[in-house]
């Protein structure tokens, strides 16, 4: 009888071990895929690292620009699209946008440029060609070189909407990423550009706009007027994968606010 009991106990232990191993094997660690805004790189990167450390699930990021990210999620090529502009009415028919943070769009010049402040009206006049020389706004006698983003960029959409310059900007160069804009302006003493506050580097100088500097505080209180949302885009009426839903919920949690702040943006929760 004792021998039989010992055999049954051994069988039970083996069975429980097998169930435990099977349970571990069933844990879904498939990555969460994101695609879109290049301005959101630091925010998504910081959130992704924190989420991976917490859950053991990787978050991938494809920096294609807001328009491409919206298209990618619409076509089912990623779990979550990333946009640095609000969804347009036609996009809202099949997609849902959820604001995760706010971001200032900084007006940037080369550090050698003596100009330190512009009004929104002056910025609009510069980008539409009414003001063409830096001397007209207190700078050097030099032609202003206009740097901007490509069509479909959320940063461009936000900038042009706020300054009222849609379809009127006379860009010298239209670049495909925030990083390219910053690099180009840093290398040209006569250039002006716009870039995400969250992505700024000390290789360029951020101007005050109407006397207000672009900071987390001025974006949050609304006194810095050139700002836009960072948006998580999902397909309306479709359920996210379990892992994508976990990341989505984490990104919107009070816990995530510290990581968004670290990345240079302004959290809407927490």
Locate predicted features.
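Bacterial N-terminal signal peptides that target proteins for export
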Residues: 1-11
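C-terminal motif of bacterial Sec signal peptides marking the signal peptidase cleavage site
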Residues: 19-23
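Exported/periplasmic ABC-transporter solute-binding proteins
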Residues: 25-78, 82-270
């Amino acid at each position: 009888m004792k021998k039989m009991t010992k055999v049954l106990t051994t069988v039970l232990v083996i069975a429980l071990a097998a169930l435990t191993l099977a349970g571990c094997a069933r844990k879904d660690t498939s990555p969460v895929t994101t695609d879109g805004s290049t301005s959101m790189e630091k925010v998504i990167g910081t959130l992704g690292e924190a989420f991976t450390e917490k859950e053991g699930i990787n978050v991938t990021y494809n920096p294609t620009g807001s328009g491409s990210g919206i298209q990618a999620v619409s076509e089912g090529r990623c779990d979550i699209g990333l946009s640095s502009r609000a969804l347009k009415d036609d996009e809202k028919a099949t997609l849902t946008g959820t604001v995760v943070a706010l971001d200032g769009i900084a007006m940037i010049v080369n550090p050698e440029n003596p100009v330190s402040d512009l009004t929104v009206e002056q910025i609009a006049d510069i980008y539409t060609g009414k003001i063409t020389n830096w001397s007209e706004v207190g700078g050097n006698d030099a032609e202003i070189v206009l740097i901007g983003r490509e069509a479909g960029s959320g940063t461009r959409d936000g900038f042009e909407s706020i300054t009222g310059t849609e379809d009127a900007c006379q860009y010298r160069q239209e670049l495909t990423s925030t990083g390219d804009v910053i690099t180009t302006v840093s290398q040209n003493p006569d250039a002006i550009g716009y870039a995400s506050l969250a992505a700024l580097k000390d290789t360029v100088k951020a101007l005050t706009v109407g006397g207000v500097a672009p900071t987390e505080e001025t974006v949050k209180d609304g006194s810095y007027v050139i700002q836009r949302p960072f948006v998580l885009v999902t397909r309306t009426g479709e359920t996210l994968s379990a892992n994508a839903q976990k990341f989505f919920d984490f990104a919107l949690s009070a816990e995530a606010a510290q990581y968004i702040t670290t990345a240079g943006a302004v959290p809407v929760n927490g």
